Amino acid sequence: MIDRLVRDSRGPVTERNPPHMSLSAGPAEISEGLDNQRTLGVSPLISPALLRQELPVDAAIAKTVAHGRSSAVDILHGDDDRLIVVVGPCSVHDPAAALDYAHRLAEHAAGVRDELHVIMRVYFEKPRTTLGWKGLINDPDLDGSYAVNKGLRMARKLLLDISALGLPVGCEFLDPITPQFIADTVSWGSIGARTAASQVHRQ
């Protein structure tokens, strides 16, 4: 009787209305009906070590990153009387435009280096209270395809290109995973308002 009611209650199969399981279903069928109801597909993620090998940091870039970090530390500790200025777009969606911006900013930064420590804001991820585009790393094509490996490559390549100009970069870290792919190219990392109380970040 119950099995008949279950069969009769079946409606059209949609993402919001997954198929009901028969009481006689086996473990594999039950698991398939319950697991990953909101997952459309799974793709392997490139490892941080492989991406770093594919897009390495050279000596000049490493020097820019180290100098950017040490200068920021000196300013925050009061050993350098310059101001830190983090300037750049809200979030990068066009690497070519961001690199053009970086060229222009590097010229200005060179002219004020005695008064200001200029760091380019290069944010790739968008913290979201609700829904919306989550940034270049998560959805580089802005079409919902979520080509994360492509996004990670684009992000790391852009950070290397900007640092090669002698301009240090700053990024917001929304989770402890992304820094494994790009942290060696970043001079200044931020924790945003939405993640300020994140237990994962505290750990």
Swiss-Prot record:
One of its GO terms (biological process) is chorismate biosynthetic process. It catalyses: D-erythrose 4-phosphate + phosphoenolpyruvate + H2O = 7-phospho-2-dehydro-3-deoxy-D-arabino-heptonate + phosphate. The keyword Transferase applies. One of its GO terms (cellular component) is cytoplasm. Keywords: Amino-acid biosynthesis, Aromatic amino acid biosynthesis, Transferase. InterPro entries: Aldolase_TIM (IPR013785), DAHP1/KDSA (IPR006218), DAHP_synth_1 (IPR006219). Pathway: Metabolic intermediate biosynthesis; chorismate biosynthesis; chorismate from D-erythrose 4-phosphate and phosphoenolpyruvate: step 1/7. Residues 1-10 have a biased composition (Basic and acidic residues). Its EC number is 2.5.1.54. It holds the Pfam family DAHP_synth_1. Stereospecific condensation of phosphoenolpyruvate (PEP) and D-erythrose-4-phosphate (E4P) giving rise to 3-deoxy-D-arabino-heptulosonate-7-phosphate (DAHP). Belongs to the class-I DAHP synthase family. This is Phospho-2-dehydro-3-deoxyheptonate aldolase. It comes from Amycolatopsis methanolica. The lineage of its organism: Bacteria, Bacillati, Actinomycetota, Actinomycetes, Pseudonocardiales.
